[in-house]
Amino acid sequence: MEARSWAPRGHLCPPGSMLLAFASLLGCLLTSSQARVYSRCELAKVLQDFGMEGYRGYTLADWVCLAYFTSGFNTAAVDHEADGSTNNGIFQINSRKWCKNLNTEVPNVCQMYCSDLLNPNLKDTVICAMKITQQPQGLASWEAWRRHCQGKDLTDWVDGCDL
């Protein structure tokens, strides 16, 4: 019987993709250790402390509803889109326009890394969300808000919260 020799038939992954995969994994591990899932009342209180009540005409209930339907109140939520962009943090802010991921050619309107949007203290997230809300669409920039929150009675989202 003839012995077979094993030799790689070429690269299984394009050059640099292993480094990209490792960096992504490392980023996930670092941010997941800081993950926080807020309760609706905890989130409402934090957003109130940041001055979000009434910002651009939106209530705390609007923001809490948005956070629930985008991330389930999870600060470390990251969703990968087919175009390679990511939705990041409790409000699922997209890297296509608002924050900097690995692609350096994006506008980065919020002037921050997308990983900054995963921080449980929410400071960077609130700053970026305020910039998004300054756009003509306001909270309607988020499909989840249009679909689940817009035009609805949202009082239950903050009902019983000590604000």
Swiss-Prot record:
One of its GO terms (cellular component) is acrosomal vesicle. Residues 36-163 form the C-type lysozyme domain. Interacts with ASTL. One of its GO terms (molecular function) is lysozyme activity. This is Sperm acrosome membrane-associated protein 3. Belongs to the glycosyl hydrolase 22 family. GO terms for biological process: fusion of sperm to egg plasma membrane involved in single fertilization. It is found in: Secreted. It comes from the Eukaryota. Residues 1-35 form the signal peptide. Keywords: Disulfide bond, Secreted, Signal. The keyword Isomerase does not apply. Disulfide bonds join 41-161, 65-149, 99-114, 110-128. Pfam families: Lys (PF00062). The keyword Signal applies. Sperm surface membrane protein that may be involved in sperm-egg plasma membrane adhesion and fusion during fertilization. It could be a potential receptor for the egg oligosaccharide residue N-acetylglucosamine, which is present in the extracellular matrix over the egg plasma membrane. The processed form has no detectable bacteriolytic activity in vitro.
